[in-house]
Structures are given as structure tokens and as C-alpha cells.
Amino acid sequence: MITKQSSNESFDVIVVGGGHAGCEAALTSARLGLNTALFTLNLDRIAWQPCNPAVGGPAKSQLVHEVDALGGIIGKLADLTALQKRVLNASRGPAVRALRAQTDKRSYAHEMLKILQNTPNLKIREAMVTGLEVEHYPNQIDQKTPEIQERIGFIKGIKTYFGSVFHAKAVVLTTGTFLGGRIWIGNQSMSAGRAGEQASEGLTEELKKLGFTTDRLKTGTPARVDRRTIDLDSLDEQLSDASDKFFSFDPLSWKSGEQMSCHITRTTKQTHQLIKNNLHLTPIYGGFIDSKGPRYCPSIEDKIVRFADKDSHQIFLEPEGRDTPEMYVQGFSTGLPENLQLELLRTLPGLQNCVMLRPAYAVEYDYIPATQLEATLETKRISGLYSAGQLNGTTGYEEAAAQGLVAGLNAARLVNNKEGIIFERESSYIGTMIDDLVTKDLKEPYRVLTSRSEYRLILRGDNADRRLTPLGYQLGLIDERRWKIFNAKQQLINQEKERLEKERIKESDKSAKEIYSSTGTPIKGSLTLANFLRRTNIHYKDLITFNLTTQSIPLDVEEGVEIDIKYSGYLERQKAQINQLKQQSKKLLPKNLNYNNIETLSKEAREKLTISQPKSLGHAAQLPGVSKADLTALLVWLKIEKMKKVKRKDSLQITN
């Protein structure tokens, strides 16, 4: 609450938390010229990767590409510190292909700290933020009912554990797992945001006083083992296959160090039996905690209970850095007591003599259900207060980084008296994620997935720059150098597409005979190079093989050209669907409509629509509890009502 204490320092924007969301938020604000401060509990753990030291994966890599296309940092650092890179879903379509990098966690954190320390307009402070300075609007001071969503005041700054006050015009909260954090190993627990680091006190209570609803979520991390005690020669080796691919669109960031291998082992009957015998000792199955954990990153005991018919589960052994023997045991997080964890690890082939350096643990923490936020990530109750990352109920460095960029951008725009930027779900995975967060009543940690987007063929990683870099340039997030690089790339793509649509292969050409000899498919008459590229199992590299190119072009240009041509029909169809949806969202809904009379709506949708009385289908789509099926039902209802009006009008004319 507002205090009479004088401020130690004043800033335009304060970011609370130095994780992946906080770093992106602070950098974005500072690069837009705002006097920005980043407050963190531990300067030595900036942008730490407390769980898997990896960036990317399905849908997550698309997020990283999008953040980079908007001038963010996560993609550049992932490229710089990558130990291994692989393309996932390589044999599938471009909508679901993903780049994943195993990163050097210490190097990643070190490089991020260097960037923060050398960014103009940005200051870093080590302190525990325990309170918020808020000035209430008149007659709003006692309005603390979460159901009432109108603003009750505006942010004035923050207060630290030792009583210092720092004023700001906007505050971004990115507290990760530190609010009320408690780590669990078996039935034993201690207050901590993560292993070896204290939890944050006071801020949850402060948010509750301001009328925010909070809840608890859980996540976990597996044990770390000593690489030198693993029989790696007995295990399947997983090599890098994408050292020439990058998250960033900036060629200055295209650096690849020596690649390191990962290894694969599997659980055994002994593994499963040991877990079954001791399930009652884990925090969840023992009933010590009941917070929901991430569905798509389950503990090993969850896997064995959920998939009881499976005899074995794949486990990956991944390096944590070039200068450490620690190996991350991916897919093997557990809540078992520490004295059983080593026994469990030693049931895995290759790990019979392993040494456990750090035990696995679960962490339980407070979060704010994101339905209390606008799509700009500003809270609905307090003007100028923003929230990003795990505090909003998400899981993952990539999700956090994307939210941090959005929150930092909009906090800066608020200070500059500019309208907030909303990322639409049809324009980006950033928009898809935020739309899901602020409109759906989520009860478990949210992870971005390709299946969450209706427009995933358009929202690919390779075209994130085409979708978002013009916006980034317009907003001041992309500098002139990057803008020139972007335009040069687009020009190359367009020129090559035009060439392929014009130039033809004739049946009598030497290249046509070579194609028939190599593929068994003849060229009949003549064929444009674009139509040749549209053939199944033909790729741009085949144009090079058959001497059908006129110049050497970069790999990212080749990829853009191939996808644009090969999937042109699908892409046009999806663009048409998006345009149709935009038109539909503008359709107005009648005032004081009795939604209870529309039987095709779900019960929850009727309740929410009756209370809210949205002006249009677009507004209805933003309400929590209103599904896509409900929107379709409303659209059908509007069409039927329109037809009824036409019939009534016709009947009146006939009568007259």
C-alpha cells in the first residue's frame, strides 16, 4: 500500500525477478529508452536454468523465433551457448518441426548478466521485494473482492524486505517459483524458491490484500549425476544434427561451438517395482501436497502410474555444460526420498555405479490465475502493474521469455502514454499463449503446444520474422541493421519464388533426363520449376542437384522459398480462414440478450455471457469459459435470427 516513506530511487519501469521473463522485460523496456531497474534475489543466478538446461522443442522453438523476431535475447543466447542442437519432427510437416538446443547453463547465465550490465538505461539491484506501493482511486480503497474486475488504483513503486522504497510508473512482476516457494523431497520440505535459494516473502499476502486471487502449482526437476561415473559406451549416443541451424534471425548470432553428445537409457522392471513399492513416500501420492504439476512433463512415478501397461520409458542423459561433469537425467524427475533416489538411478542401464551430485526435488509455489490480466499482461485491478512468466501459471523458459517481452513492451508504452500492444492468436504463438492464459480457467501449469493453435501452418518458426519483425521495427524493438537484414532476406525469397514460377523444365532438357533417371518420375512436355518443387519428395536441394538454380542462396532463404511454394494452397486456405474469422469477430451481439434461451450454448458460457453482455463475437471470444464451440453456436444463432428477420419482413410486405 502507499506509504509516507521517501523513495530511495525512482525509475520509469521496475522489473521484479531476474529469470527469463524478467530479463526480457527489463531489456525490452530499457531498449525503448525507459529508465529501468531489475530487482533480483540473487545476482549470481540471473537467467538461471534450474531445470533442463535446454531451449526450444515443439512450439517452444516457434516462441523463441518470435521473441527474436521482436528483438528479444533468448534465441541469441541459446545459439551462443548451445552444446547440442537437433531438429525434432524433421520427417513431419513444417508446422510441427522444431529446433532444440542443449545449452551450457553457466555460460548462458554469465552471458545474460554481461548483456544486462552493459545495456543503457538499465540498472540491476539485489533485493527481496516484499510490497507494492499502490495509490487507490477515490472510494475504491475497500474494494477487495476478486470478482470485481475494475481498476482500484495505480502502481507507484515497490518496497523491499529491509524497508527501502523505490518509485516507478510501471512494475512488472516475474517472480518464477519464488512466491511462497517450498521444495519437497519425499515427505520433507523447506522454504525455498529452488534448491539453495530462499523463497520470496510478503508479496503473495500483498497481492491478496489488493484483491487478487492466488493459488498453488507444482513443478519438479530430476537428479544430476556425475558423467564420469556413467558407462556411456554401453548406451545409445545421440549426436547433434543441426549445428547449422539457429534460433536467431541475426547472422551475427550464428555461432556454433563444438557439439556434445547426449545419451539414451531406459527404465527397467526394477525401476518400476522400486517406485511402486514406495509411492506412498512421494509428496503427491503420500498426500503431503495436492498442487497440480505440469501435464506434459510428468514425474517418473506419474508415468508409471498413468501408463501402467508400459514396461519401459526412455530416459535422456544430457550435459549441463562444458566445464562441469553434471548430467541432467531428463524424464526422471521424482518425489522419492533422497535415500531412495540413488538406488532408483542405479536401476538404469549404464548408471549402475553412478554418483548422484544433486537429488531430484519438487517445488510448490504461488501463482496468479491469469484471467486477472488484460491481454497486454497488465493486471485488471492495478493500473501499471504487469505480470509475466510462471507467476501467470506457465511452465518453461520460452513461455516466460515471450511473456516478459510483452509485459516489458507494454509497461514501457504505458509510461510513454501509448496504447498497449495485443498479440492476436492468429498472428503468433505469443498471441495464442496469452489468449489462452487470460481467457481460460487453467488449473495446471500451461505449456505452449502446436496443437493449441488453429493456425500452426502459418505460425511456423521459419517465418516468424516475416510475421513479427515489421511490427518490431515499428515499435522500436528492431534496429536499422536488423531491418536491412530482414528486407534483404525477403527480397531474395520473393525473387527466387518469381524465378521458379517463370522458368520451366522441358522434356528434352538434359536435366529432365537426369531427374527421370534419379527419381523415376518423367517430365512430360514442360513444367515450371515451382510445380516441380511441389512434387512429393522433391526439395530445394534437388534443384541444386539438377543444376536448376542460378545463384547460391542462404539456407534460411531456401527453406522459406520451399515452404511458400510447396504449401501455397494450404497457406492461402488458412489465410482465408483467418480473414473470415476476423470478419466474424466484428459481428455485433444484441444488447441485453437473454443467453439462457440459446440452448446450444454451454451452461458456463450462458452464465459468463449473461453477466458480461459482450458487444461483439470478438469480445465474447475473450471471456473465460466461452469455448470455440460456444462461439460457433452464437454465430449460427445470429444467422438464424437474421433469416427470421428477413422472413418477417417478406411476410409483412406480402400482407401489405
Curated annotation (Swiss-Prot):
Q: Which domain of life is it from?
A: Bacteria
Which species does this protein come from? Prochlorococcus marinus (strain NATL2A)
Functional description taken from the UniProt entry: NAD-binding protein involved in the addition of a carboxymethylaminomethyl (cmnm) group at the wobble position (U34) of certain tRNAs, forming tRNA-cmnm(5)s(2)U34.
Q: What is this protein called?
A: tRNA uridine 5-carboxymethylaminomethyl modification enzyme MnmG
The record's annotation in SMART domains points to: GIDA_assoc_3 (SM01228)
Required cofactor names: FAD
What family does the Swiss-Prot or TrEMBL record give for this protein? Belongs to the MnmG family.
The protein's location, in the record's own words, is:
Cytoplasm
Gene3D superfamilies of this UniProt entry? FAD/NAD(P)-binding domain (3.50.50.60), GidA associated domain, C-terminal subdomain (1.10.150.570), tRNA uridine 5-carboxymethylaminomethyl modification enzyme MnmG/GidA (1.10.10.1800)
Residues binding FAD = 17-22, 129, 200, 390
Q: Example GO biological process term?
A: tRNA wobble uridine modification
Chain sites annotated for binding NAD(+): 293-307
Provide this UniProt record's keywords sorted from A to Z: Cytoplasm, FAD, Flavoprotein, NAD, tRNA processing
